[in-house]
Regions:
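Conserved glycine-rich cofactor-binding loop
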Residues: 11-12
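Conserved glycine-rich Rossmann-like NAD(P)H-binding loop of the short-chain dehydrogenase/reductase
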Residues: 25-41
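Active-site-adjacent segment of SDR/Rossmann-fold oxidoreductases
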Residues: 126, 144, 165-175
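Residue(s) in the substrate-gating loop at a strand-loop-helix junction
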Residues: 139
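C-terminal helical subdomain
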Residues: 179-182, 187, 196-244
């Protein structure tokens, strides 16, 4: 039995591109993101590709939003064939001894804690008789410290370990999990990085953009697709799109 695929952060960038690739491959997609005009656009595009798709507004920084979204998903679908945990935020881009505590906490909540909360609330819909593939979107920042990105680095490192734990504990429940780093992609996150004047490496990222080194979200999504739907990739793997 094939169920729906849940993609978080699906209103734009990599998330929207992955959601569209999955829907175009013939699967219903649940697109999750904060309420916005972009989410509405994504919903219309997905409906044209697969009429059983759905968009749900949800802020992964808000536990009540996560609970409400999980309830809607459970009321409309019986099984999730896959989850793509793509939602994330780069900020705060600040020295870790100067950053506001609330901003740092929100980054950890959105990038890491919300992943566990949402997945846990959907536990009755994943694995068991039918396989579920969980993919988390990783980053090079999970492997090395980037100045002024402390919250993002910590969250992404934690997300990699979360994925490994899910791979270990989910295997007996017919769940496989893996993480994929997309490389440097032309998204709104990159726009925010290039605008961060106090970021020590800002000129590096401006150069990536000006010299055309950024990947297009659609190209990255095509590489992600076979892993998201379980046709490629092993349980517990961590991959980089640039090596595929």
């Amino acid at each position: 039995m094939t169920g729906a695929y849940l993609v978080t952060g699906a209103s734009k960038g990599i998330g929207r591109a992955i959601a569209k690739e999955i829907a175009a491959a013939g699967f219903p997609v649940i697109a999750l993101a904060r309420e916005s005009i972009d989410l509405g656009v994504t919903g219309a595009e997905l409906a044209n590709l697969n009429s059983n798709s759905l968009t749900i507004s949800c802020d992964l920084g808000d536990g009540a939003d996560i609970a409400a979204a999980a309830k809607i998903i459970a009321s409309k679908y019986s099984h999730l064939s896959g989850i793509v945990h793509n939602a994330g935020m780069i900020g705060p881009i600040e020295h870790m001894l100067e950053v506001e505590g609330a901003d740092w906490d929100r980054s950890i909540q959105v990038n890491l804690i919300g992943v566990q909360d949402l997945t846990n609330r959907l536990s009755s819909m994943i694995g068991d008789k039918n396989h579920t593939r969980i993919v988390t979107v990783s980053s090079g920042a999970a492997k090395r410290a980037v100045p002024h990105w402390s919250a993002y680095c910590v969250a992404k490192a934690g997300l990699d370990m979360w994925t490994m734990c899910m791979a270990e504990e989910g295997e007996s429940k017919n769940i496989s999990a893996m993480s994929i780093s997309p490389g440097i992609v032309d998204t709104e996150m990159q726009v925010k990085i290039r605008a961060a004047e106090k970021f020590p490496l800002v000129e590096n990222f401006r150069s990536y953009h000006s010299t055309g080194e950024l990947s297009a979200p659609g190209d990255v999504a095509k590489q992600f697709l076979p892993y998201c739907i379980g046709r490629l990739g092993g349980n517990g793997q961590r991959l980089d799109v640039r090596d595929l």
